[in-house]
UniProtKB/Swiss-Prot annotation:
It catalyses: L-glutamyl-tRNA(Gln) + L-glutamine + ATP + H2O = L-glutaminyl-tRNA(Gln) + L-glutamate + ADP + phosphate + H(+); L-aspartyl-tRNA(Asn) + L-glutamine + ATP + H2O = L-asparaginyl-tRNA(Asn) + L-glutamate + ADP + phosphate + 2 H(+). It is an enzyme of class 6 (ligase). Belongs to the GatC family. The lineage of its organism: Bacteria, Pseudomonadati, Pseudomonadota, Betaproteobacteria, Rhodocyclales. Heterotrimer of A, B and C subunits. Its EC number is 6.3.5.-. InterPro entries: Asp/Glu-ADT_sf_sub_c, GatC. The keyword Ligase applies. This is Aspartyl/glutamyl-tRNA(Asn/Gln) amidotransferase subunit C. GO terms for biological process: glutaminyl-tRNAGln biosynthesis via transamidation; regulation of translational fidelity; translation.
Length: 95
């Protein structure tokens, strides 16, 4: 796939980018180079290759799931305007 000069100008217009003819020609070359690279990558046979999320087989170190703060629910709800059954009540906004 390659872009024509008119297509590059149209894309620039849609993106609200002012572009001169020289800039459009340069941009056309850059974009067509990118499309050629994509075509080369798509031509590679990847049959039998398992997809991967990362280039290296590493895993994230996880910290221990431990409580670090005490339960302050009662203190927070003591200053709330209205609560019911441990839940905060708020005024109805949408009818």
């Amino acid at each position: 796939m390659s872009l024509t000069l008119e297509q590059v100008k149209r894309i620039a217009h849609l993106a609200r980018i002012e572009i001169s003819d020289d800039e459009a020609l340069t941009t056309q070359g850059h974009l067509n180079g990118i499309f050629q690279l994509i075509e080369q990558m798509q031509a590679v046979d990847t049959t039998g290759i398992e997809p991967m999320a990362h280039a290296q087989d590493v895993s994230q170190r996880l910290r221990e799931d431990a409580v670090s703060e005490g339960d302050r629910r009662a203190a927070y709800q003591a200053v709330a305007p209205e609560i019911e059954a441990g839940l905060y009540l708020v005024p109805k906004v949408i009818e």
